[in-house]
Amino acid sequence: MSGKTLYDKLWDSHLVQQRDDGSALIYIDLQLLHEVTSPQAFEGLRLAGRKPWRVSSSLATPDHNVPTTKKERISGVDGIEDPVSKIQVTTLDDNCNEFGITEFNMKDIRQGIVHVVGPEQGATLPGMTVVCGDSHTSTHGAFGALAHGIGTSEVEHVLATQCLVQKKSRNMLVRVDGELSPWVSAKDVVLAIIGAIGTAGGTGYAIEFGGTGIQSLSMEGRMTVCNMAIEAGARVGLIAVDDTTIEYVKGRPYAPKGEHWEMAVEAWKDLVSDKDAQFDEVVVIKAEDIKPQVTWGTSPEMVIAIDEPIPRAEDQKDPVKKEGYARAWKYMGLEGKSMLSDIVLDRVFIGSCTNSRIEDLRIAAQVVKGRKVASTLKQAIVVPGSGLVKAQAEKEGLHEIFEAAGLEWREPGCSMCLAMNADKLGAGEHSASTSNRNFEGRQGFGGRTHLVSPAMAAAAAIAGHFVDVNEFVKH
């Protein structure tokens, strides 16, 4: 009998019941909640006269709708100008109070993007099953956890039963072998992976990311990679537990303490795929082939290295791809442009659940230090992923570096990742964004999003257009 993959181990250890139709009942260790997908779930509990099965297994924080300017944040919920956003945040506060669920509200320094808060609090732990009404819950797979997004009705189901009906995915291994080049980050790695396998390449799979190129990443970097597994079509992204994982978790508020810590670490050592484990699909990418990446179109798979020409629709042999490229060219306003450096940027956004952790901000600050934002740029904002990230960055003086360069230093939240708060693109505006999606209208109606790493976004803010950060930092 062959060994088990990490995904198999996590699945089997949480299997409550296997059903004849191929579905299974899976136990859920942690549910993260935010203001957008939880109101209907709580209302469902209320109408049915139910209580949460285990309140200690849920953690909430508002993130999608919260304003990020200091002026608006001083008043807490009352500072939210949009009435719908205000209702959603207020409703989360009320629901958490009524049902006894821990919430880091807008006035709590621990508030932030749910996928930043869970790990930094140690609420996300190796070996767990983690769900949230948000597709980027795959982020938590960086800890050797089985994590994925769920719908609102499923949010209610988990609140009521602490279980979920699921169908098991197949196993895919994406191995990044070798050593990454200077200034090539986790964001470049995952964009290159999506470019290679496509946005449907991981459909039906749980992707385990491995190889020396992945193992060399910090936990912040690993979270970036797993965060975008969903953009490759996979609900689940996983990375095996190692010393890097354990060191990150150690001492965090929700992490085990004392003898429980020692017992946990011993158990976590098995959270790796067995050497003889069989994967349904294996993809191998050479780390040294990965260069700084930039998306040019309206899908994460429309991505190229900074030094490559923008692909043209007329050069595509596949008629479906040709049509998609033509639409993307028109939407993105690329006529007359051949290289990414030809695109004049309007705004730069450094933040989101993909790239708003302290490591991301340190890298961006390193690039902009002693420089000034391009005069052609309308706006450049830096939005930390949580109040604790913000406090740490300010302790290190990173906010002073950003502000001296002309970037705005904001309060924590999802911000310009999506057009659900005051931070948006105008129609026809181009952004260099460290977020995870570049669909039509994602950052605002008619907005044109280019996904990049924090280093590339920082360099673009100074240059006013896309440049290779490797060349940029030399001058």
Curated annotation (Swiss-Prot):
GO biological process: L-leucine biosynthetic process
CDD domains tied to this protein: IPMI (cd01583)
Keyword Transport included in the entry's annotation: no
Cofactor entry: [4Fe-4S] cluster
Pathway note: Amino-acid biosynthesis; L-leucine biosynthesis; L-leucine from 3-methyl-2-oxobutanoate: step 2/4
Pfam family for this entry, one: Aconitase
Catalytic activity line of the entry: (2R,3S)-3-isopropylmalate = (2S)-2-isopropylmalate
Cofactor note: Binds 1 [4Fe-4S] cluster per subunit.
Residues given in the record as [4Fe-4S] cluster binding sites: 353, 414, 417
UniProt entry keywords in alphabetical sequence: 4Fe-4S, Amino-acid biosynthesis, Branched-chain amino acid biosynthesis, Iron, Iron-sulfur, Leucine biosynthesis, Lyase, Metal-binding
Listed PANTHER family: 3-ISOPROPYLMALATE DEHYDRATASE (PTHR43822:SF9), HOMOACONITASE, MITOCHONDRIAL-RELATED (PTHR43822)
Function according to Swiss-Prot or TrEMBL: Catalyzes the isomerization between 2-isopropylmalate and 3-isopropylmalate, via the formation of 2-isopropylmaleate.
Family matches, as HAMAP family: LeuC_type1
Similarity comment text for this entry: Belongs to the aconitase/IPM isomerase family. LeuC type 1 subfamily.
Complexes and interactors: Heterodimer of LeuC and LeuD.
Protein name stated in the entry: 3-isopropylmalate dehydratase large subunit
Organism: Marinomonas sp. (strain MWYL1)
Lineage of producing organism: Bacteria, Pseudomonadati, Pseudomonadota, Gammaproteobacteria, Oceanospirillales
Gene that produces this protein: leuC
